[in-house]
């Protein structure tokens, strides 16, 4: 079992079309390995391999970089088809990069002249939708130069959760299949939205379908939150995360949706497991504010019991049990999502961020 090495987590990218759908190499100067911490800053959990590649598995991981040149490309190995990235350059609205299964070079930017650019490359997909490996970045054949990457914010947030925290369905469009991977976009999830509003870094430690004690199907012997929280890559138990690499100022936990999917879980079991998990998180970040959020999906429905009311009651009891001013409840309303899918929409993620922002500003003094 190994600990993940973590260069400062962020890189960069940009584009002129809305979707890069095919791989195409860019003529370049000698490529720069993706693990160079003087050139690339990474935000989010990642693992550096012995070969110097940088692997991502959690949603929202972002690479930040700056360069002077007229072209930029990245070599990516995707474990699955349809891995999507938002490519943001110089503050412009992002373009979308699609990576297909396997190894390929992808153009990120091609300009008419040499210029200085700042780029961010962000993983959109949920955790279960496949790991991606960044191998190297390349400048164009014309004169190019790597510049020091942009400094990351000093403030640090972390959000632990399920598919809601991943940003599932946040980018859904009615013309698109509800199962399409393009519907996910961690960059505009509530956690990353509120982090940008507060001028903070953001780590999303989240996995769709998982809970505190059981997943959405009621399965207990899978990697639920207490297990995947310890990992650099959510589906690789051999790669442990070194919590000293990133110590948040505040940690939001939104869990319970999947625990309650098969019915109301036993009170003592759920509360005890949740308390133990928060205590572990507090040991890793002793000074952090921890705020427990209601599920925006769980609802009181005829035939399914008062699930929302019970979950809220459990959370209240957890806060009392922990007995610390640094552990608080952050109430959230229910959001209906779209017909036939209860995940919050993009507008509803904006609303959740709007609920959390004033609370965090007040409690953190930000």
Language-model segments: residues:
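Conserved SGNH/GDSL esterase-like catalytic core that processes O-acyl groups on lipids
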Residues: 58-61, 101, 127-132, 170, ...
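N-terminal secretory targeting modules
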Residues: 2-4, 10-15, 21-160, 164-186, ...
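Structural recognition of the beta-strand scaffold that forms the well-ordered cores
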Residues: 156-160, 165, 202-206, 249-254, ...
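Extracellular serine-dependent O-acyl
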Residues: 289-296, 307-341, 346-366
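Sec-exported extracytoplasmic/periplasmic mature domains
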Residues: 165, 199, 203, 256, ...
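Residue-level detector of flexible, active-site-proximal loop/helix-junction positions
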Residues: 101, 164, 209-211, 297, ...
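Glycoside hydrolase catalytic-domain groove-lining segments
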Residues: 265-290
């Amino acid at each position: 079992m190994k600990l993940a090495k973590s260069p400062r987590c962020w890189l960069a990218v940009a584009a002129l079309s809305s979707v890069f759908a095919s791989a195409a190499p860019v003529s370049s100067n000698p490529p720069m390995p993706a693990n160079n911490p003087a050139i690339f800053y990474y935000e989010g959990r990642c693992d550096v391999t012995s070969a110097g590649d940088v692997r991502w598995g959690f949603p929202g991981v972002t690479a930040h970089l700056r360069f002077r040149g007229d072209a930029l490309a990245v070599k990516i190995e995707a474990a699955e088809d349809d891995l999507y990235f938002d490519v943001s350059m110089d503050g412009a609205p992002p373009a979308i990069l699609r990576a297909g299964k396997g190894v390929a070079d992808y153009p990120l930017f091609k300009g008419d002249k040499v210029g200085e650019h700042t780029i961010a490359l962000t993983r959109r997909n949920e955790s279960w939708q496949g790991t991606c490996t960044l191998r190297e970045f390349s400048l164009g054949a014309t004169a190019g130069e790597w510049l020091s990457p942009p400094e990351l914010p000093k403030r640090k947030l972390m959000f632990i959760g399920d598919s809601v925290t991943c940003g599932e369905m946040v980018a859904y469009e009615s013309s698109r299949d509800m199962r399409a991977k393009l519907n996910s976009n961690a960059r505009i999830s509530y956690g990353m939205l509120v982090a940008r509003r507060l001028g903070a870094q953001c780590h999303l430690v989240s996995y769709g379908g998982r809970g505190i004690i059981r997943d959405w199907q009621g399965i207990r012997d899978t990697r639920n939150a207490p297990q995947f929280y310890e990992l650099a890559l959510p589906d690789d138990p051999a790669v442990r995360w070194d919590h000293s690499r990133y110590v948040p100022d505040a940690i939001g936990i939104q869990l319970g949706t999947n625990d309650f999917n098969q019915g109301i879980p036993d009170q003592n079991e759920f509360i005890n497991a949740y308390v133990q998990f928060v205590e572990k998180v507090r040991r890793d970040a002793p000074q952090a504010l921890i705020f427990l959020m209601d599920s925006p999906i769980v609802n009181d429905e005829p035939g399914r019991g008062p699930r929302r009311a019970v979950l809220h009651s459990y959370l209240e009891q957890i806060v009392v049990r922990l007995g610390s001013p640094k552990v608080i409840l952050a109430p959230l309303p229910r959001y209906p999502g779209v017909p036939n899918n209860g995940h919050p929409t993009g507008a509803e993620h904006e609303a959740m961020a709007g609920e959390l922002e004033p609370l965090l500003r007040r409690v953190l003094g930000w």
